[in-house]
């Protein structure tokens, strides 16, 4: 009897975690993520990313040579800080991440997404650190970058770090693929093929991000930073970054 009850409780908890995770990465969340390409639009206009193969290469490069040292790493560190209720450390990570985002549009896009995400979920998650962080944003002590807020909310929900990282990377990859399919353009099936091929790289990215090497924080693909800055001067644009 007791073992059956425990199994049912574990199952219900697992389903609750899944529901929370799906809500956190819901593409219909009103935060404006679909408005940002983070430099991809420049790559497409310059005919560097112009096919299914080049888009697939671009996504994998971003995942394994950029995100794991930047947004993914800061998400991982923020998750740790949230576990220990270390508000000061969360502020430090916000400042550090701000310094690594050299392209203005990408920098502003990230904290706008983070502020909107926090505004949604703080209504459901009554946590003192979340409230303190929102207050720090309103007082302009921190910016509220998306990966930091994402980690804080996920940890508050009781999600694991591995699940949080996978969801974050998956969400980012889907955004890039969706934008690439629209910009190049490609067929919807091409986009699905690219996404299917990311299953193993996504797992690899999670493994590499669980315990980030602090010496590699901020390491990035310079080409992407340059295109993200060039995006400000494009003659025609579909995206805000």
Name each model feature, range by range.
Residues 1-19:
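Charged, compositionally biased N-terminal leader segments and the immediate start
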Residues 17-85:
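Glycine/small-residue-rich interface belts in oligomeric ring/scaffold proteins
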Residues 21-30, 59-65, 99-106, 134-140, ...:
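A short glycine/serine-rich beta->alpha loop
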Residues 46-53, 124, 128-132, 156-164, ...:
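Inter-helical turn/loop segments and adjacent helix faces that build the functional surface
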Residues 72-73, 77, 84-154:
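Internal, conserved structured core segments that host functional sites
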Residues 139-184:
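A contiguous pocket-lining binding segment that forms or flanks enzyme active sites
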Residues 171-241:
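C-terminal auxiliary extensions adjacent to catalytic cores
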């Amino acid at each position: 009897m007791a073992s059956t009850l425990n199994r049912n409780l574990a199952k219900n908890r697992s389903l609750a975690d899944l529901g929370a995770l799906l809500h956190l990465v819901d593409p219909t969340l009103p935060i404006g993520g679909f408005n940002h390409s983070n430099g991809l639009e420049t790559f497409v206009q310059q005919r560097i990313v112009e096919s299914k193969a080049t888009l697939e290469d671009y996504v994998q490069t971003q995942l394994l040579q950029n995100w794991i040292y930047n947004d993914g790493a800061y998400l991982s560190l923020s998750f740790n800080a949230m576990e220990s209720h270390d508000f000061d450390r969360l502020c430090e990570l916000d400042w550090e991440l701000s310094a690594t985002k050299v392209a203005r549009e990408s920098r502003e896009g990230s904290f706008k997404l983070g502020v909107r995400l926090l505004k949604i979920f703080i209504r459901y998650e009554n946590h003192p650190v979340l409230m303190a962080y929102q207050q720090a944003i309103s007082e302009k002590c921190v910016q509220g970058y998306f990966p930091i807020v994402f980690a804080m909310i996920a940890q508050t929900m009781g999600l694991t770090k591995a699940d949080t990282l996978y969801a974050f990377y998956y969400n980012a990859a889907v955004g890039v693929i969706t934008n690439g399919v629209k910009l190049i353009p490609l067929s919807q099936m091409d986009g699905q093929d690219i996404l299917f091929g990311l299953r193993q790289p996504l797992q690899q990215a999670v493994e590499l991000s669980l315990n980030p090497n602090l010496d590699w924080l901020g390491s990035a693909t310079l080409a992407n930073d340059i295109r993200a800055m060039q995006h400000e001067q494009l003659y025609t644009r579909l995206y805000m970054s």
